[in-house]
Amino acid sequence: MNYLNILLYLTIFILFSMILCNLYMKNKAKIVSLENTQEGFTGSDSEVKSIENNKNLASVGNIQSIGKKYADLPLKEYCIKASYNSACSGNYVSKDMIRHVLSRGCRFLDFEVFYIKHKNNFMPVVAKSTDPKFVLFDTDNHIPLEEAFTSIIGNAFSGTSPNKNDPLFLHLRIKTKKTECYNEVSKLIDSILKPKLMEGEVNEETKVSEMLNKIVIVIDKTVHRDYKDFAKCKAQDVNCYDISNYTHLESGSQVLNKLTLSQVENQPSNPIMIKDDNVSTTAEASKLVLPISKNTQNPKIQKMILSYGIQIVAYKYDEQDKELEKCEDFFNDNKGGIVPLASAITYFERIDTEQKK
């Protein structure tokens, strides 16, 4: 009897081990170590083309740059078309995907930045990761941050973008505590983006008209709230580039609140009201919502704006779902990638009324 029990336990153990091994190999095929990922975007062409050929997305023919007379409100009074992990087309990251989201009229681009060893040197790169320790990538490749910035400066203010005169917000989630990375990121901003860089800080009173045709750098302070301490240049290092000299806004701050989709949906509804002038609202700060990384569904823009007054709702452009289509319809119907919050509330209130009939 004892031998039968031992045999049974042994069989169960072997089966369980095989299941775990199979799950591990599946994940390993998808998630690879930072130092072993391919540089560049070999294999991404078909992914980007598939996304570009999606006939369900509204034409961007109506989208245009915001007119100066409509841009005189503070930043918090505008909804901005935003993409999440803007270089990601699914399994790959590429400069072609950056060009695509810009061609759709997105003016808030989001990137995860890592610092990895390349040959004998370290360099900042763009990839996608859900690893809390930032040791593994979800994408099968990475691209140098330099390549991403070059794609941005070459496409954001050219005919590629239907709203090329709008300000462009670059949201950098820098996932390292290495001082050298912040120095390298700052150096790339200085050498590539500087001609279009906004001068001075941006706060809750800064008007969009003051940022037209400019790049605004946004650093995610929630990754490392003390990032300024270890990113600070030493007095004797004259060749160091301090990230604080290139940062206009911080997400996770009082000026730009940063929330995950799950955080928002766990809160009670808190609608923003349109004031009696029919132009401004009761919004006190700009709010940014990022989708859940491991969730395939995009946020519901109607709910985000009407129930919570979220101005910047970032979308996964590699997830071609109905919610992305609704986001595209909204910005296309309102003829811009930057739309007054009051207009957005009115637009979705009308849709909400029609849905209840």
Task: Tell me what each language-model feature is.
Residues N2-F108, F114-S191, N203-K357:
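Long, acidic (Asp/Glu-rich), low-complexity accessory segments flanking structured domains
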Residues P195-M198:
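Charged/polar low-complexity intrinsically disordered regions
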